[in-house]
Amino acid sequence: MQKLTILGATGSIGASTLKVVEQNPELFSVVALAAGTNVEKMVALCRQWQPKFAVMADKAAAVALQSEIHTISPNTEVLGGVDALCHVASLEEVDSVMAAIVGAAGLLPTMAAVKAGKRVLLANKEALVMSGQLFIDAVEQYGAELLPVDSEHNAIFQCLPQQVQTNLGRCNLDEHGISSILLTGSGGPFRYADIADLDSVTPAQAIAHPNWSMGPKISVDSATMMNKGLEYIEAKWLFNAARDQLKVIIHPQSVIHSMVQYRDGSVLAQMGEPDMATPIALTMSYPSRVDAGVKPLDFTQVGELTFLQPDFARYPCLKLAIDACYEGQHATTALNAANEVAVDAFLNNRLGFTDIARINELVLHKITASCKPENANSLESLLELDRMSRTIALEIIRERS
């Protein structure tokens, strides 16, 4: 029986993780559930799962949760705050930690799981985007096991030799005959829209992803293709890929989730229904496979598969992320922070859709002009850089409104 802590239990990844647990009750049990502020959803989860621990990142939300569940889940200990998140991520009795807290907020608890030597099911791409080499070094130092949950990275993982799968962040692709990794993305809801019309895109339109069911932040990131940019950075670290080994391709149908191209001309692709339960189930059961509750892909219903080059005029955020990836850790940390602030402002109608890229570019320019890569070589310096980038982004947004 594998015991789990689920960080981000009330989000879409958390829901899919619990779906896999429900499908395989003899294999998995839930020890701790953690979320941000959504007390209502957490109450429902505590009622159903009766976890040993329920944690809210927001301490006021933890107080509210305690008053709601003391009768329906009397044996659940309610905790609040970042330290509590780190505590349940590193519990001795826990085998695997689903790291699915969205954004920079997930870095510290994910790192706590790494330092406790856990099997870390990494859905929080921002942890790698923000901390890069520090994260990879910590995985090796503390003997943690890293498994990628993002559908694209999970697809790539499945197409790689076992020697690479068990040596993430340290592998040599060239030694294993791998010429390139092809990271696919749907292009989001605006891939065929007139670029001139993107200025007037509303939050409701941006979060309506054509293929995947996701939370609002990642849905907006998919619309700008910043999500693919962050995934590009994550792939660089996970697979130790050089710039000429990593490519982005738009694949509107989201049937092929990513591909690996080998030196001999072979291309291995992982395909399936666009359901996050599939990659989640693999990371939970690796190297075995379990029932994820996902219907099999019906090839007779797939129709055509199309592939396009990304248009950087349509997706400036993607270009920013790729360039930042090779500027240094300070650049990717700053870009991630700026983007979180800009997307939040857009979702709250304080910023236009195309302004997201403008804010990101301005913050990136200010940080890279004043900060050197060597200034981002510790967790403390990265968190300070994250804070500084958010402050700059907020100031720019205030000036524009």
From Swiss-Prot:
InterPro entries: DXP_reductoisomerase, DXP_reductoisomerase_C, DXP_reductoisomerase_N, DXPR_C, DXPR_C_sf, NAD(P)-bd_dom_sf. It catalyses: 2-C-methyl-D-erythritol 4-phosphate + NADP(+) = 1-deoxy-D-xylulose 5-phosphate + NADPH + H(+). 1-deoxy-D-xylulose 5-phosphate binds at K125, S151, E152, S186, H209, S222, N227, K228, E231. GO terms for biological process: isopentenyl diphosphate biosynthetic process, methylerythritol 4-phosphate pathway involved in terpenoid biosynthetic process. Its EC number is 1.1.1.267. Mn(2+) binds at D150, E152, E231. Belongs to the DXR family. Catalyzes the NADPH-dependent rearrangement and reduction of 1-deoxy-D-xylulose-5-phosphate (DXP) to 2-C-methyl-D-erythritol 4-phosphate (MEP). This is 1-deoxy-D-xylulose 5-phosphate reductoisomerase.
